Each structure stands twice: as structure tokens, then as C-alpha cells.
A protein has these predicted regions:
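P-loop (Walker A) phosphate-binding loop of NTP-binding proteins
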Residues: 9
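Conserved nucleotide-sensing/catalytic segment adjacent to the nucleotide-binding pocket
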Residues: 30-31, 38-72
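Conserved phosphate-donor/acceptor-positioning beta-strand/loop module used by diverse small-molecule
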Residues: 79-97, 183-192
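Post-Walker A helix-loop "phosphate-sensing" segment adjacent to the P-loop in P-loop NTPases
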Residues: 23-30
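Hydrophobic anchor at the beta1->P-loop junction of P-loop NTPases
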Residues: 6
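Phosphate/Mg2+-binding loops and adjacent switch elements
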Residues: 85-177
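Conserved small/polar residues in nucleotide/adenosyl-binding loops
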Residues: 216-222
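Conserved glycine(s) of the Walker
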Residues: 13
Length: 222
């Protein structure tokens, strides 16, 4: 089984990475408490899961040491374990939190100590907590990456082929309304209607004579 552990700084892009891994066929778990890593990985392997990814953040720092020690046990069982650590500059993290207007996860935890940390303090504290993880992880700085670029990078990281594009063509009548799930609608009422040709009326668009009637007209060529 292939197991990717996605971790890093809040605002670094973990959610984007997890969504891309899910699109690439991975069984994904977001915000997993670190102490559950070993039992869940063992359960997934037992159930025949071939590729899984879990996201763990700094809120599990109290159990980090035991959890990441368990990775050795997973490797000994033949599980291909890799850690992806996503980071960014302080300025970029501040910008991202400002855009989303979300609170830093360590800010809320700090309330139990009688004072809430500022965003700058929370980022600094998180860097301190997560520093040991970077020693064994593949570190990616996402400061200058667009979300689309990060998704492509993650796809290459796990060596998954690009998702296949699925096209569904559907004919419809305007009097019955547009198909609600359409992404693109083409008005082809300017083309000749084979229905009004007696020899073509019994046929469908899958028949070659109908296709020829439509494709080789001057309007279709334009």
C-alpha cells in the first residue's frame, strides 16, 4: 500500500493537496489526529486499500513523536510511506489567512492558556512545533505556487496519470428546456434537419447517412 502523510503549516496548501490526491484515486482522510495514524493505516491495508493519504496538522503535536515512530513499523510491513510537508513564507501565510478570514488553528488552542495568540505568534509557534517533522519529510514551499500548479505538482509527486476527460454529448429539444447539468450548449438549429427527409426520418444520429447529411453541408463546414 502507498501511504502519503500530508502535513505542514496551516495555510500551506494541505486541503488542495488532499483534494488532488482524492481525485487521483487515493482514499483520503483530512484532519486525522496523529495517534490514530497507525491503527487506521493497518486497517486500510487489511481491507486491501492500495493508496491512501492522511492530513495531519499541528494540533496533534502532543502525539507527533509516537505517531511518526510508528511509521517505522508501517515501513517494515511493506507499506510505502512518504511525508509531504507544505510550507510558505510568513508574508504569504498572512495574505492567505487575510483572504479567507479564517482563524489560525493554534490561536483557538491557545485560549486554554488564558490568552489568544496573534496570527504572527501562531505562525511562529507552528513553525517551532513542526520543525522536527521536516527532517524526514519532502518539503515543498508553496509561496509562489498557484492552486492549479500545486495540484499538478502533487499529481507528479505520486506519479499518477492525469485524470481522463469525460465528454458526454446529449441532444435535446428547446421546448423541453436545457439539460440542467450542461457545461456547454450549442445551438445547431441552423443545420438541416434530417427528420424532414423521408429516407432519413427512420434513422438516428448513429447512422452514417444522417451523419453525412449534417457534416457535409456548407453550414456545418462553416
Amino acid at each position: 500500500m502507498q501511504l502519503i502523510i500530508v502535513t505542514g503549516l496551516s495555510g500551506g496548501g494541505k486541503s488542495i493537496a488532499i483534494r488532488q490526491l482524492e481525485d487521483s484515486g487515493f482514499y483520503c482522510i483530512d484532519n486525522l489526529p496523529a495517534e490514530f495514524l497507525l491503527p487506521i493505516a493497518e486497517n486500510l491495508e487489511k481491507n486491501g486499500t492500495r493508496a491512501a493519504a492522511v492530513a495531519i496538522d499541528a494540533r496533534s503535536h502532543a502525539t507527533f513523536e509516537n505517531a511518526f515512530t510508528a511509521l517505522e513499523a508501517l515501513s517494515q510491513r511493506g507499506i510505502d510511506v512518504r511525508i509531504l510537508f507544505l510550507t510558505a513564507s510568513n508574508e504569504e501565510l498572512l495574505r492567505r489567512f487575510s483572504e479567507t478570514r479564517r482563524r489560525h488553528p493554534l490561536s483557538t488552542l491557545a485560549e486554554h492558556q488564558g490568552r489568544e495568540l496573534t496570527l504572527n505568534e501562531a505562525i511562529a509557534r507552528e513553525r517551532e512545533i513542526m520543525a522536527p517533522v521536516t527532517e524526514t519529510a519532502h518539503v515543498l514551499d508553496t509561496t509562489r505556487l498557484l492552486p492549479s500548479q500545486l495540484r499538478r505538482w502533487v499529481q507528479q509527486f505520486v506519479k499518477q496519470p492525469a485524470a481522463k476527460l469525460t465528454l458526454t454529448f446529449e441532444s435535446f429539444g428547446y421546448k423541453r428546456g436545457l439539460p440542467y447539468a450542461s457545461d456547454l450548449v450549442f445551438d445547431v438549429r441552423c443545420l438541416p434537419n434530417p427528420y424532414y427527409s423521408p429516407e432519413l426520418r427512420p434513422l438516428t444520429g448513429l447512422d452514417a447517412p444522417v451523419a453525412s447529411c449534417l457534416l457535409y453541408t456548407s453550414d456545418a463546414a462553416d
